């Protein structure tokens, strides 16, 4: 959670910054208010999964940063007004197989929304990493992005 206070001019500058863009013409869930003297927002991550143990690992979760979240000097915030759903599935070999010291296969998927409910992004990725017995390696990945709508590039 964040709560920032300041003069109307400084809060207006925060509302208009690239992180927030309260003045977007397409956004109906936020309003640019030049008289405001504070912003209060939330952000977080809820994640469950399994790491370690056998060959299969996974994680899934949800993270968010509300439109008024402002980390200011205590952290890094590229963009507010986002909700992410994600899922990752990983297969790892722990023992050499044939000419490979280890094999890593990863599948990941995520969706991004804003707090107005707009579905802004979908992405799928498949990655492979093969390490040979002599420690040389080959990596490849395939990414599919059937939906990309970036509301910060509208300016």
Task: Please give the residue ranges for each predicted region.
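Exposed, low-structure sequence patches enriched in small/polar residues
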Residues: 3-155
